[in-house]
Amino acid sequence: MGLMIRSSSIHAAGCYTTSRIAKGVQVVEYTGPRITKQEADARFRNSPTTYLFGIGDGSTVIDGHGTAMYINHSCDPNCETEELDGRVWVMSLRAIAPGEELTYDYNLYDGDEDDARCHCGARNCRQTMYSSEEIARQKKALKQKARRAVEAKRRKAAAVTQAKKGGKAASRSNARKKATRR
């Protein structure tokens, strides 16, 4: 099976097949050094583009090198990834024609800092590379943040109102004290 890297309409460069690939085939292995998530976070803190692939529970990542690192995200992919015996394989979801770009759904998670816009152009595009679960988690977090902000404003307004009432009460009480002293 032949694969080649060339320009992609999805993102910069992409991985294309030069021959037909049947459904359910191991297309290519995702390879590269294995590093901890903490090491990856430190190493790539200021890098807008990475080729990291979380494996297992996510505490280890593959710093992608080789052909598979050029496989782009699509919301309507022709491949998927599968962990087999500690290795990550890109598997075909359907028959893929020669010249077709290989794609899989990145299903990103843990995305508090980046919107990870998707440019796949699929009819069912989510507009992001995050998984549906991550999108739901982010929406819930935003709602909670908005609720906390509203509650903080309410508490502040109540404190201001209370201070004004307390100030008026103190002024009246001081006026009464002055009046009784005379």
Predicted regions and their residues:
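C-terminal SET catalytic tail plus cysteine-rich post-SET Zn-binding segment of SAM-dependent SET-domain
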Residues: 75-182
